[in-house]
C-alpha cells in the first residue's frame, strides 16, 4: 500500500511537471511602450486585477476598457468551455500576473495560459474587439519527432484539423460566451495511441474570421511531425498532444489521498531529477521490449481494424434493420438510422449480396475509404462483416439529403440564396478533395442532389463515395461497358462512349448547380411545361436570349444577389460543355465561385446533338442507370 502511494505521488508530479512545461505563451507586442507608474500603467494594473472576477461574472468571457486616449486600456479575457468558476478565476489571475511580469512596459500583449484549464487574457492601447489579431505569433512544439507511418498519420491529421476548424468556427451560439468557437477532439492514431486536439477563437469574431484564423494556424505548422505543440495568435489558438492535457479532456490534478505533508524546494528538485532518470530508463526499456517483440511476434494488426463493428451492435442500433429506421434504398443496398449504446447516431448501409469481395479485401478497401475525411464529405466510421453481411457505418447527417429540400414545395422555402450558395461552394470543395487533395484520386460518377447530405448547419456533405472498391465493380480507369450513374447527370462522353474522368464529375456538378438555382430536377424536366428538352437546354436558351435570371427559383422572390446568381449560372454552363477539355476543373471552379476578379470564358452551346437517340431509354428509367453510387479510385 505504501509503495502504491509512492508511485501515485510520483505520477502526480510527472503529470504536473509535463503540464507546467507544455506551453507558456505570453507574447509581448514590441510595437509600443509606456512609462512605468504613469497613467497607462495604473489603468493596466487596475483592469487586469479585476479581469478574473469579471470573466466569471460574465459566464466565461468578458471585454472592456478603462481610461481615456492616450492612456486608454482595452482588455479581453476568457476560459474554455466547461471550466469551473473558481478554476477559471485562478487561471486568469495567473495569466494577468504573467502579462504584467513578462511584459513590464509593452502597450499590447496576450497570453494563452494553461493553469488547471486553458484561459486567455489580452490588453492593448487600441480597440481590438471584433478584429482578427494575427500578430505576434506564438508557436511551440516538443523536440520529439514522429518518424514512422507519416503518410497514414498525416491523413488522420488533415481530417482532424478540417473537422476541428469546421466545428470550432460554427456559429452555433449567438451569445458572446466561451461556448462559442470552441472544439476539442480525440482521434485514434493506432489501437493504443490517440491524438488530442483543441481549437478555439475569441467569441467576438465573425464565423468566417474565426475559420480563417484557425486555417492559418494549421497551415503555419504544416503536417503532423512532433508529438505535441501549440500555435497561437491574439484571436485564436490550436493545441494538440499525443496525451490528454488539462482542462479540455476532463483531467484532474489532485494529490493522492494521504499526501498532505509540505514539500520542500530541495525535495521538489529531487523529484524532478528522479523523474527525468525514470523516464529515460523506462523509455529505453520500452524500446528494447518492443524490438524483442517485433522479432518474436507476428506483425500487429493495422490500426484500420479498429474500424470494425460487430453485427450485434449494428442490429441493436437499428432495431434489427427495422423498416421504421430505413432512411433510403439504392442499388448497393438499404440505409438505416442507428443509435449506439452511448447515444451517438449513425447511418448504416447494408450492402446487397452481390458484392464479390472477400473478407480481407473488404476490410482493406473500407479502411482506405475511411481515411478520406473532409468537412464536406460524409464520414465513414467503420464496417461490419459477419457471415453474408457486409455493412458500412457512416456519420449520421440530420437534415438528410438536398433533394428533400430542393424539390419539395413545402421545404424549399428553407433554402434561401445564402444557403444555396453555401451548398454549391461546399459541394465543390468536397469534390475537389476527392479529385486532387485526398490520398487517392476519386471520380464520384454519381454526383446528384440525393447524394448531397445537409448537416444541422445546412453545410453540404458529399455522400456515397468510395463504393466502387468496396463493392468491387468491374471497371477500368478510363472507360467501362457498364454505364453507371443517374440519368440527367451523366456526361455525354460517358453515356455514349463509356469514357469517364474528373470532367465527368464536373458535368454532374454543373447540372446540380442549375438544379440548386432553379429548384427543378433535370431528370424529369421533360415532364414540365418549360421550353427545352432538359434543364441544361432550358438554361442555355435563357442565357442565349439574355434572360438567365428567368431560371431562378420563384421561391427566392428576388431575395438574392443578381451578380452572384448570374455568375453561378455562367459557371454551371461552363461545367456542362460538350467537350470535356472545355470544362474547368474543380480548383478553377472554386476560384471562379469565390473571386469576382477572375474573368470567365464565354460558354458554348451545351446541346449534344447525338444525345437524342439515347434520351428515350434514359427517360424510361425510374431513377438512374444504376441507382447506386459508383466511383473510381486510383492510388496516387
UniProtKB/Swiss-Prot annotation:
Q: Which InterPro entries match?
A: GNK2, GNK2_sf, Kinase-like_dom_sf, Prot_kinase_dom, Protein_kinase_ATP_BS, Ser-Thr/Tyr_kinase_cat_dom, Ser/Thr_kinase_AS
Main localization category: membrane
Q: Name one GO molecular function term.
A: ATP binding
**Which residues are modified to Phosphoserine?**
450
Give the transmembrane region(s): 267-287
Entry keyword set: ATP-binding, Glycoprotein, Kinase, Membrane, Nucleotide-binding, Phosphoprotein, Receptor, Repeat, Serine/threonine-protein kinase, Signal, Transferase, Transmembrane, Transmembrane helix
The Protein kinase domain is annotated at: 321-600
- The reaction(s) this protein catalyses: L-seryl-[protein] + ATP = O-phospho-L-seryl-[protein] + ADP + H(+); L-threonyl-[protein] + ATP = O-phospho-L-threonyl-[protein] + ADP + H(+)
What is the enzyme's main class? transferase
Keyword Glycoprotein annotated:
yes
Tell me the Pfam families matching this sequence: PK_Tyr_Ser-Thr (PF07714), Stress-antifung (PF01657)
List of glycosylated residues: 29, 63, 105, 125, 149, 173, 185, 188, 250, 262
SMART domains associated with the record: S_TKc
Under the heading PANTHER family, the entry gives: CYSTEINE-RICH RECEPTOR-LIKE PROTEIN KINASE 33-RELATED, RECEPTOR-LIKE SERINE/THREONINE-PROTEIN KINASE SD1-8
What this protein is called in its record is Putative cysteine-rich receptor-like protein kinase 33
Provenance organism: Arabidopsis thaliana
Amino acid at each position: 500500500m505504501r509503495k502504491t502511494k509512492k508511485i501515485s505521488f510520483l505520477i502526480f508530479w510527472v503529470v504536473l511537471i509535463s503540464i507546467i512545461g507544455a506551453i507558456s505563451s505570453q507574447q509581448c507586442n514590441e510595437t509600443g511602450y509606456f512609462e512605468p507608474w504613469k497613467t497607462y500603467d495604473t489603468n493596466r494594473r487596475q483592469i487586469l486585477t479585476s479581469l478574473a472576477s469579471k470573466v466569471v461574472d460574465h459566464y466565461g468571457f468578458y471585454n472592456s476598457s478603462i481610461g481615456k486616449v492616450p492612456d486608454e486600456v482595452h482588455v479581453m479575457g476568457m476560459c474554455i468551455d466547461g471550466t469551473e468558476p473558481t478554476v477559471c478565476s485562478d487561471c486568469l489571475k495567473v495569466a494577468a500576473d504573467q502579462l504584467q511580469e513578462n511584459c513590464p512596459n509593452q502597450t499590447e500583449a496576450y497570453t494563452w495560459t494553461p493553469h488547471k484549464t486553458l484561459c486567455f487574457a489580452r490588453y492593448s492601447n487600441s480597440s481590438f474587439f471584433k478584429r482578427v489579431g494575427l500578430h505576434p505569433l506564438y508557436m511551440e512544439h516538443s523536440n520529439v519527432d514522429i518518424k514512422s507511418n507519416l503518410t497514414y498519420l498525416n491523413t488522420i491529421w488533415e481530417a482532424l484539423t478540417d473537422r476541428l476548424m469546421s466545428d470550432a468556427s460554427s456559429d452555433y451560439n449567438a451569445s458572446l460566451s466561451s461556448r462559442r468557437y470552441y472544439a476539442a477532439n480525440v482521434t485514434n492514431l493506432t489501437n493504443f495511441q490517440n491524438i488530442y486536439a483543441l481549437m478555439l477563437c475569441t467569441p467576438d469574431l465573425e464565423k468566417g474570421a474565426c475559420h480563417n484564423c484557425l486555417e492559418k494556424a494549421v497551415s503555419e505548422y504544416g503536417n503532423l511531425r512532433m508529438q505535441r505543440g501549440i500555435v497561437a495568435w491574439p484571436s485564436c489558438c490550436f493545441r494538440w498532444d499525443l496525451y490528454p492535457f488539462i482542462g479540455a479532456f476532463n483531467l484532474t490534478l489532485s494529490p493522492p489521498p494521504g499526501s498532505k505533508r509540505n514539500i520542500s524546494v530541495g525535495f521538489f528538485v529531487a523529484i524532478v531529477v528522479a523523474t527525468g532518470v525514470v523516464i529515460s530508463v523506462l523509455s529505453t526499456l520500452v524500446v528494447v521490449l518492443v524490438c524483442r517483440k517485433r522479432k518474436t511476434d507476428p506483425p500487429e494488426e493495422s490500426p484500420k481494424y479498429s474500424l470494425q463493428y460487430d453485427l450485434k451492435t449494428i442490429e441493436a442500433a437499428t432495431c434489427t434493420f427495422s423498416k421504421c429506421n430505413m432512411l433510403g434504398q439504392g442499388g448497393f443496398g438499404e440505409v438505416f438510422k442507428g443509435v449506439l449504446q452511448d447515444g451517438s447516431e449513425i447511418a448504416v448501409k447494408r450492402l446487397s449480396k452481390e458484392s464479390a469481395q472477400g473478407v480481407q479485401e473488404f476490410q482493406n478497401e473500407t479502411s482506405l475509404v475511411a481515411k478520406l475525411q473532409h468537412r464536406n464529405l460524409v464520414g465513414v466510421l467503420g464496417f461490419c462483416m459477419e457471415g453474408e453481411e457486409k455493412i458500412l457505418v457512416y456519420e449520421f447527417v440530420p437534415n438528410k439529403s438536398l433533394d428533400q429540400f430542393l424539390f419539395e414545395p413545402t421545404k424549399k422555402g428553407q433554402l434561401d440564396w445564402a444557403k444555396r450558395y453555401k451548398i454549391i461552394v461546399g459541394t465543390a470543395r468536397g469534390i475537389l478533395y476527392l479529385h486532387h487533395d485526398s490520398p487517392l484520386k476519386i471520380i464520384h460518377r454519381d454526383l446528384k442532389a440525393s447524394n448531397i447530405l445537409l448537416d444541422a448547419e445546412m453545410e453540404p456533405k458529399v455522400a456515397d463515395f468510395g463504393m466502387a472498391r468496396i463493392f468491387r465493380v468491374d471497371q477500368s480507369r478510363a472507360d467501362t461497358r457498364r454505364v453507371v450513374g443517374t440519368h440527367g447527370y451523366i456526361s455525354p462522353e460517358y453515356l455514349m462512349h463509356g469514357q469517364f474522368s474528373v470532367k465527368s464529375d464536373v458535368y454532374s456538378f454543373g447540372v446540380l448547380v442549375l438544379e440548386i438555382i432553379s429548384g427543378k430536377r433535370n431528370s424529369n424536366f421533360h415532364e414540365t411545361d418549360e421550353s427545352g428538352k432538359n434543364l441544361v437546354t432550358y438554361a442555355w436558351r435563357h442565357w442565349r436570349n439574355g434572360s438567365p435570371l428567368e431560371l431562378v427559383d420563384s421561391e427566392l422572390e428576388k431575395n438574392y444577389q443578381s451578380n452572384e446568381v448570374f455568375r453561378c449560372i455562367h459557371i454551371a454552363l461552363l461545367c456542362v460543355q460538350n467537350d470535356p477539355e472545355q470544362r474547368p476543373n474543380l480548383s478553377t471552379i472554386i476560384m471562379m465561385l469565390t473571386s469576382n476578379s477572375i474573368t470567365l470564358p464565354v460558354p458554348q452551346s451545351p446541346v449534344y446533338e447525338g444525345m437524342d437517340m439515347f434520351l428515350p431509354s434514359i427517360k424510361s428509367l425510374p431513377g438512374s442507370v444504376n441507382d447506386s453510387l459508383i466511383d473510381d479510385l486510383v492510388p496516387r
